[in-house]
């Protein structure tokens, strides 16, 4: 039991079984209360403050006694997972969570009533490093690059240089969107690029090793070597649906460069970063040596560092921003205050109102940001580059928000828990969505069989598929498969096939696992099974083609 002086933080079971919903890329699962039998028995997942073991911050926040108490409570938050009547529960504080998830460093900034009330950093810049992360340490923002880039594009719209609803080919000079049957009646527009409704391919970008040849932007758009992604093309009618596309944002980048004649980092620095006071941020790819010395090292899920410390992203608008949580918080505050008509450093109130309006109602994608129907006023984005993950959320109505960045492919797993702690401590009226599962944490600390046993016992309580089901095991399998535990990944995927034999996807995943472990015939067998159940599974077709190629 915590010492009474700690003011222990407690997050309820339903809240922790449902993660943040400002993540943009999947349908939001509806949160519902868990069975009382589950709450009363073994299988809750909640957070409490632990007075005896806390993560030690690397930066001291200037704050009042009350604020320091809030910070201490969040820092002392512990994940507590009861495992059963005969087994000791799992209890971890923030630093232990970071260690369990192979997160070397984490940095965060908290916003209350439109002000950054504190910013702190934890851990080190890389696995095995003794250099601490500070609030000035630079992290890759991943897809949070997109709303910052969208702000620059909207500034050009305000000037009349660009139009939201004009065919982008009218402004593009160095490259054009190839016309096809899908663009006959509906065109690719800037509004559709920013809202992922333009019908464009290529979800995201893996980046390039620091010593690899870099493609031009046109080579990226055409999928020409040395680009490492497919051609960016329209493959459904623009405006007819929403599908996340970093490829579309790359067209947005080229269009801004074409109409201004400026290098993208210069354009963003002049039009957005300097005006908001984001002095530690930039889109330079690769970074100049002086700024490179200020960065964290990207880290894979298994704790190994990214070769060369990070990847380079010529797709700057989609994935190229280097920044800090404090700078991201400044950005979020400016957007919120512009929406309230209290600031116009970059965009007017009218423009930001349009920026935060979903293009396709109910689907969430606005112009650069994602917004949440269940949380009025909330906007945000998450991000992931090779070895880095980040979260940004803000509410323009309440003035509350936070930015969290980590140098790990598991960063969001820890950031989710921290974000809920912040929301609880500061009394945010925030409805979480999308299932959060403790399975990976259990697998890491108690073994994969313990995680599968936990899953089985939890299902016996009648918990819904949204909370714990096929998707939960599939995610666990991939986390293990690409986190240095391939055989454990195979074990999880085999269990998923056993439990959900009518799903074509479970066979596809098991096929991928076998391919990774070098069991070619088993990989072919499972891909064939998946394709038999779902003839439209293009992934299985492509994988089978590669597996059957003569060496």
Region roles according to the model:
Residues 81-139, 177, 227-232, 304-306:
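Short, conserved catalytic-motif segment at the N-terminal edge
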Residues 122-126, 180-386:
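Short, surface-exposed loop or secondary-structure junction motifs
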């Amino acid at each position: 039991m915590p010492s009474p002086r700690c003011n222990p933080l407690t997050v309820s079971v339903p809240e922790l079984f449902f993660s943040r919903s400002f993540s943009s890329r999947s349908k939001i699962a509806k949160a519902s209360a868990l069975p009382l039998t589950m709450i009363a028995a073994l299988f809750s997942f909640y957070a409490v403050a632990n007075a005896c073991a806390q993560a030690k911050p690397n930066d001291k926040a200037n704050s009042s006694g009350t604020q320091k108490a809030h910070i201490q409570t969040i820092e002392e938050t512990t994940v507590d997972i009861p495992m059963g009547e005969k087994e000791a529960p799992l209890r971890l504080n923030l630093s232990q969570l970071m260690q369990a998830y192979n997160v070397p460093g984490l940095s965060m900034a908290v916003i209350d009533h439109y002000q950054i009330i504190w910013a702190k950093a934890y851990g080190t810049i890389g696995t095995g490093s003794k250099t601490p992360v500070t609030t000035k340490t630079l992290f890759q923002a991943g897809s949070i690059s997109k709303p910052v880039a969208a702000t620059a594009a909207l500034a050009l719209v305000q000037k009349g240089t660009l139009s939201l609803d004009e065919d982008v080919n009218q402004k593009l000079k160095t490259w054009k969107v190839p016309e096809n049957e899908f663009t006959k009646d509906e065109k690719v527009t800037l509004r559709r690029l920013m809202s992922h409704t333009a019908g464009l391919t290529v979800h995201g970008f893996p980046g390039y090793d620091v010593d690899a040849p870099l493609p031009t932007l046109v080579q990226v758009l055409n999928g020409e070597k040395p680009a490492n992604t497919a051609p960016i093309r329209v493959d459904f009618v623009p405006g007819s649906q929403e599908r996340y596309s970093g490829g579309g944002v790359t067209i947005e980048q080229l269009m801004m460069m074409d109409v201004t004649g400026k290098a993208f980092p210069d354009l963003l620095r002049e039009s957005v970063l300097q005006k908001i006071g984001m002095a530690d941020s930039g889109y330079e790819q690769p970074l100049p040596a002086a700024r490179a010395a200020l960065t964290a090292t990207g880290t894979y899920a298994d704790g190994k560092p990214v070769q060369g410390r990070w990847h380079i992203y010529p797709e700057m608008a989609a994935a190229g921003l280097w920044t800090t949580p404090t700078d991201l918080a400044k950005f979020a505050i400016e957007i919120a205050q512009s929406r309230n008509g209290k600031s116009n450093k970059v965009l007017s109130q009218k423009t930001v109102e349009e920026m935060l309006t979903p293009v396709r109602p109910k689907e969430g994608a606005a112009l650069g940001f994602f917004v949440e129907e269940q949380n009025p006023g909330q906007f945000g984005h998450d991000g992931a580059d090779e070895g880095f993950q980040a979260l940004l959320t803000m509410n323009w109505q309440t003035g509350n928000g936070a930015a969290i960045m980590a140098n790990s492919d598991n960063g969001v797993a820890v950031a989710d828990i921290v974000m809920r702690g912040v929301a609880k401590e500061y009394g945010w009226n925030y409805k979480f969505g999308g299932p959060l599962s403790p399975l990976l944490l259990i697998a890491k600390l108690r073994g994969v069989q313990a995680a599968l046993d936990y899953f089985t016992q939890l299902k016996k309580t009648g918990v819904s598929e949204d909370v714990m089901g096929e998707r939960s095991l599939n995610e666990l399998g991939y986390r293990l498969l690409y986190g240095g535990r391939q055989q454990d990944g195979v074990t999880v995927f085999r269990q998923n096939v056993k439990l959900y034999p009518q799903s074509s996807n479970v066979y596809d995943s098991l096929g991928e696992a076998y391919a990774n472990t070098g069991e070619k015939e088993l990989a072919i067998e499972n891909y064939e099974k998946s394709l038999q159940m779902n003839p439209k599974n293009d992934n299985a077709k492509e994988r089978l083609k590669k597996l059957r190629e003569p060496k």
